[in-house]
Each structure stands twice: as structure tokens, then as C-alpha cells.
């Protein structure tokens, strides 16, 4: 591949898996994130574990800061002078009853998941105008399925998917392809609490996957490598599910996790029996 790539949120989880797969494809990868210690540890692990002609650099970056994102793009493109691949992976989650959700919670999720992705796509596209490139945003099946107790997160990912489609339509003339990947549940740092303490929710996810298993970060990375390469050169504006078939069925039931955090009285004020997928 021998291309330059930027992966936001590349220090852990799906972002780490994406960086590893891009390095395996001989890309010159820069991972970005807010915590330098996390990035340094990730870079050391990648350098030690990935055997290829790829390379790894780090840059501290808060994706909600447009100037910081432009600086990160410049770092990623520095050695070659151009950026070939940008992966807008940085994101946060939030869950809880709609009636108790605050506008601050919604705003904070949108700020990272939508504005942060916008900053990344725009900065990368500005660099790619002369030579083209591939931009991939990491969305979620939540953007397609919605679901109870996920109003902030699901709406942010739905907005991200439409941002991708709109950007793809405008940027195609520059030879820039823009797509998103909608992962299903992936075992990573971000989902560790569910795997360790809420196996019933993971089981519910599996029941709604035709393939019957959860994903690995590297499987999302494989999809990124395909979207970044010549094999997908006629693909743009697409929201691609990498989810074991989950979007063929329904959203997971998060009620047990939410109910565990509330008293019966609190819960009765926020949700009514029979309103869930199994009700």
C-alpha cells in the first residue's frame, strides 16, 4: 500500500485495530488522540507486534478543536507531503433514559461524534484535493437501528452517516472517496464493562446476529484497508455494516443495564413496561 494514513482515536480499541491493519498493509500510520501516554504505549505495541514496511507516529489531538485536527493532518502528511487515508474514528458513547437525559449530554456526544468527524473529514479533504484519497468514518449500527436508552449516541451516528454521504457527493470531483463503517458490538476497551459485568446484554447482541458472535477490532480494520485501497475505487458515499448481520434484525435490549442503575421508583417515572423490544 505504501500510503500515509491518519487514525483519530487510534490508541485503543477499534482505532488500534485499524492502525494495526493499515500498518500490515505497509501504510505510514499516524495515530491521534487526547492522551500522549496512551498513544505512546499503543505505538510501542504496534511497532513490536506488526511485521511490515509500515510505520507509526503519534500526535496529540482533540478532534473537537478544528485547528488541532488540521495540525494532526499536517503531521500525518509531513514525510510524504500528502495524506492518502483518513479514518475519523474518535467517538464517545452515552446511554440512559430519554426523559432524564440532559441537553449537555446530547451536546457533548454530538460535539465529538459529529463535529469531531466533520473537522477530520474537512481537514483531510483539504489536503487531498490535489491528489485524491479515501476518508472513512467509523459509525455504528446504532445509527441505523436506534434503540431505547441510546438517543444521544444513535442520533449522533445517524448524523455522521448523512454527513459522510453529503461530503462524498461534494468531494468526488476531487477524487476523494468518503464512506462510513457501521460496526456491530466489538470486544474492546470501550465495551469491556458489558463483557465483564453484563453478559446477558452481550448474549442479546449475539441472538440478533446471524453469524452469532461479536466482532474484533481487527475485523473493522480489514474493512478500512479495503475502503482505503484500489479494490474499492468505485465505492463512495456508502454506510457499510460490519456487524455479523446485526442490522438485519433489531437493536439490543439495554433495559437490564439501565434498570440496574435506578431504583424501581426512578425507573417507573422514566420507562413503562411493555415499551421495549421484548415487551
Residue ranges and their predicted role:
Residues 121, 156, 164:
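Active-site helix of classical SDR
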Residues 101, 146-154, 166, 194, ...:
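Active-site loop-to-helix junction immediately N-terminal to the catalytic Tyr of the SDR YXXXK motif
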Residues 140:
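Residue(s) in the substrate-gating loop at a strand-loop-helix junction
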Residues 126, 169-173, 233:
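Alpha-helical segment proximal to the catalytic Tyr-Lys
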Residues 97-98, 105-107, 205:
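Substrate-binding pocket helix/loop in short-chain dehydrogenase/reductase
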